[in-house]
Amino acid sequence: MSDRITVEGRDGAFGAYIARPKILRAPGVVVLHEVFGVNADIRKHCDELATQGFVAVAPDLFWHQEPGVDLSVTSESDWQHGLRLNQAYDRDAGAKDVKDTANAVAKLPECSSEVAVMGYCLGGLMTFLTAARYGIDAGVAYHGGDTEKYLGEVGGLNAPLLMHLAEEDEFISKAAQAEIKAALAKKPNATVYSYPGQRHAFSRNNGAHYNAAAATLANGRTRQFLYQQLRSAERTSSKVQV
């Protein structure tokens, strides 16, 4: 079941999409969008997580600039719109919004209080930043652009972190990927997977670079990671068809 909720953050209230599993008192996952806002792809990711036994919530990261952004990945004008929003995005304020969302999800009556954060592209970066700055129960980052610029904060990373990188990512150079891998290799709680031959957003549903085999592999690793790191997830998953 999907719906909209309002998150009361420290800097104001903002909207979020929520997908609930059939079995409640389930662990939560905060799903962070790309530069396209809470669009059809992000909502589909939330819906899929709900079928796997998670309370999935996608906050509107761009609410400070333009609430309710919902852009198409196939429209050039929407691409340019999203890139402009991304360039003006306040990542420091955004990390606070993500943490506030995680706190709000943990308090939902349908949530078991355990909450992971998972993001794509911009959302992948924000997953890393939130984990390093504020702490979360677990994090999953898909091809987080500009992560290499914040590796000086890796010392604050104590939560389990799973990161997926596309080896041929046109937005994350091979040199940047090497820096990310080297920095996270020092953290026993961090795992980085690389996907040979894959380009940016290979797991985006119906995206130009979507690769079914790589996406299935990455998403399977993510699901297993979430089941392992969120203690109540295993109990919930035993009652849910995955």
What positions do the PLM features span?
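N-terminal cap/leader regions of alpha/beta-hydrolase-fold enzymes
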Residues: 1-242
